[in-house]
């Protein structure tokens, strides 16, 4: 698994993820890029779960973005519908967080599209650790940026979760 976390603060959105890929009980690679920009650099995606499945979903999401001219919510809902109804896609084991400058969403394999109640979303095996750390930092008085909060949340997750490392990729919109 992995950890992907997304934070909105002061009008900025940051998504970050670690770089660890595991196969069974062993680390296969520590520098996988699970966070990437798409749609003319205006949308950032982060994925957790099976890497091959995530790439299939990312490709489908990019097609939806093109079809709907970058409209994040519409593209996410259409992807979730297809994921839920298309028999071959139902077996894919991955989750995604997608964000643009105004919205960010979690897209799950069961067809859920979730907008966060708070300004944090996190997925993957270390997701709950990262979400807790990010929420705590958002609720305290500090001068941390969204990027700094994501970095700290990923560090906490990496300290606790054996499937999350400290090689972070963070993108900000």
From Swiss-Prot:
Enzyme class, first EC level, given as a word: hydrolase
Active site: 2
InterPro entries tied to this protein: ATP-dep_Prtase_HsIV_su (IPR022281), Ntn_hydrolases_N (IPR029055), Proteasome_sua/b (IPR001353), Proteasome_suB-type (IPR023333)
E.C. no: 3.4.25.2
Position of the signal peptide: none
Gene3D superfamilies per the UniProt record, alphabetical: Glutamine Phosphoribosylpyrophosphate, subunit 1, domain 1 (3.60.20.10)
Disulfide bond keyword on record: no
Protein localization: Cytoplasm
UniProt activity-regulation remark: Allosterically activated by HslU binding.
Main location per the UniProt record: cytoplasm
Pfam families, per the entry: Proteasome (PF00227)
SUPFAM superfamilies: N-terminal nucleophile aminohydrolases (Ntn hydrolases)
A Gene Ontology molecular function term of the record: threonine-type endopeptidase activity
Keyword Transit peptide among UniProt keywords: no
GO cellular component: HslUV protease complex; proteasome core complex
Function: Protease subunit of a proteasome-like degradation complex believed to be a general protein degrading machinery.
Similarity annotation: Belongs to the peptidase T1B family. HslV subfamily.
PANTHER family associated with the record: ATP-DEPENDENT PROTEASE SUBUNIT HSLV, METALLOPROTEASE TLDD
Subunit structure: A double ring-shaped homohexamer of HslV is capped on each side by a ring-shaped HslU homohexamer. The assembly of the HslU/HslV complex is dependent on binding of ATP.
Name assigned to this protein: ATP-dependent protease subunit HslV
């Amino acid at each position: 698994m992995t950890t992907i976390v997304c934070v909105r603060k002061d009008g900025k959105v940051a998504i970050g993820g670690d770089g660890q890929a595991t196969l069974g009980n062993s680390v296969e690679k520590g520098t996988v890029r699970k966070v990437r920009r798409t749609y003319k650099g205006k949308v950032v995606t982060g994925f957790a779960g099976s890497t091959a499945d995530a790439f299939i979903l990312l490709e489908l999401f990019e097609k939806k973005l093109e079809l709907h001219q970058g409209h994040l919510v519409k593209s996410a809902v259409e992807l979730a519908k297809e994921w839920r109804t298309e028999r071959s896609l139902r077996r894919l084991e991955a989750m995604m967080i997608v964000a643009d400058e105004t919205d960010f969403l979690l897209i799950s394999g069961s067809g859920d599209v979730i907008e966060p109640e708070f300004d944090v979303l996190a997925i993957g095996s270390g997701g709950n650790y990262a979400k807790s750390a990010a929420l705590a930092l958002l609720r305290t008085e500090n001068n941390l940026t969204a990027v700094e909060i994501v970095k700290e949340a990923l560090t906490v997750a990496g300290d606790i979760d054996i499937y999350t490392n400290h090689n972070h990729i963070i993108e900000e919109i």
